[in-house]
Amino acid sequence: MSKPLVLVTGCLGQLGSAIQQHWDASQVAARYELLPVDIDQLDLTDTDDLIAYLGQLHPAIIINAAAFTQVDEAETNQEAAYAINAEAVLSLAKWCRVSGCKLIQISTDFVFDGAATAPYTTDAQTNPLSVYGASKLAGENHVLDLLPRTGYVVRTSW
């Protein structure tokens, strides 16, 4: 019997690379098969290809580490930032809702304004000050709205 599949998008980025690097040494590797993909294998902004790809693989879990991360460039290229950070996440969440797949969405501390004097909690008020932060928050909201029991958001800071 084959192991359930964990699909990791954005595998050439910082987080996707780190997941791959530590996968074999983790306890998760004994129970799940890892499939890392990047934009050259799967363009998340091409909804038709995305749905077809996921339909062939039937992953049990998707870790979405793909993102438009150029904070300054997002200000002038809002369409591209929202396409990957929000609209592609919506497509993933819709597919996961129908298929029963779990979705782990990697987000950012840029959803906050940075004014807090203590560490942010999971229920802290968001207030993004940039297009990048706003686009990532939109993606978070898609996951949490469509997948209240099987969608997870992990906010990171590098």
Language model region names:
Residues 4-25:
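N-terminal Rossmann NAD(P)H-binding glycine-rich loop of SDR-like oxidoreductase domains
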Residues 9, 37, 62-66, 103-108, ...:
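SDR active-site strand-loop-helix element
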Residues 27-35:
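A generic structural motif
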Residues 35-48:
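Rossmann-fold cofactor-recognition segment
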Residues 76, 83, 88-91, 111-154, ...:
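Catalytic helix-loop patch of NAD(P)-dependent Rossmann-fold dehydrogenases
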